[in-house]
Each structure stands twice: as C-alpha cells, then as structure tokens.
Amino acid sequence: MCRFIETIRVDCGEVRNTAYHERRMNDTRTHFWPESPALQLAGYLPAIPGSGVHKLRIVYGQNGIEEVTCTPYTLRPVRSLALIQADDIDYACKSTDRSALNRLFARRGAYDDILIVRRHLLTATSIANIALFDGSHWHTPQHPLLKGTKRAELLDKGILTEKDIRMEELPAYSTIRLFNAMIDWGEAELPTDCLHPVF
C-alpha cells in the first residue's frame, strides 16, 4: 500500500507552514484515493517542544494518518554537490519509498549530496528544492522532482521565479540555495563552482 510523508519544522514551539503541508497531504490523498475525506493536522499533533528545532514526521495513507513522531533536528552541512543524470526518476509525491533517490545518492562519491539532472534540466537534490541566483533573480526549476511546501511559500511571496534551468546554463549563476520544510531560505547556500558532474 502507498504511504506518504509530511515533514514539518517545529521552531521554538511553533509548527511551521501547516496550511501548505495540509494542502499537499490532502491533494495527495485525493489523487490516489478520490473518495478520501480531507484531514486536518491540528487533531494529530503531539506535545510540541517549546525550545529548539524539531522535525515533525507524519506518515499517512489511504486510511488517514498512521504515525506521528517529533525528533530534534540538526542541519547536515552541504558544501559540494554531484550532478547526477536520471532521466526516468519520478518523485512527484512525497512517498515513504525513497529507494530510487537512495540509489542515486549512493553514486555521489566524495561529494556531500547530489543534484539530479532529468532530461538535461536541473531538478532538486536528494532532500531539497533548489534556487539559483543570476545576480538579479532567484530562479527555481519549473519541473522539480517534488513541489515542496517551502518552495510553494517562496513562490507565493514572490521571492522565487520558476524557470527551466539547463545544466549548460550553470555558468550564468553564481550561487545555489537548498531549501525544504526543514531548511529555511538562506540557511544552506554554496557557490555554483561546488557542483561537479558525475556521469
């Protein structure tokens, strides 16, 4: 049976971006199980720690929310990315099955993470959406592996612009940022010369 995840940042007792997570969870359930009722996260939240950053992990499926955990979170530093080609990968929904991503991640060699290239277009790392800076604007791939909740928020705020970004266009960009529900905007940034093709 298909199972999916929402990973939510809890920052000093504040559960972040619940509306975006709730919308994606219910959109996913409607896609796979059209008759499924909408769920509200508020009814499933555990006791929330009042200090520090925590990862709230919600596993759900056809029958609703199945598992909720809340654990301390530490950002894993990323200082280099291996560009990995994977034309057939599909991770449009945040599934518990990450086996395809894990196989690609295992090919990273000495680099910290991977940046997946699908049909010549940049998509995402193994865990995060990306944005690249051209000196004036932050562009995020129009067709990422997964349309993350932080990505949706940044697009709604006008901070990001969607654009197809081809690998050969990388010299036009100076900086890449990684972000997701747990990694805030500006928290993970590196120069584009830290991206290395591994084909």
Give a label for each model feature.
Residues 1-121, 137, 143-199:
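Conserved alpha/beta cores of soluble small-molecule-handling proteins
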Residues 123-129:
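Short beta-strand/strand-turn micro-motif
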Residues 133:
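Short beta-strand-to-turn element immediately C-terminal to the catalytic PLP-Schiff-base lysine
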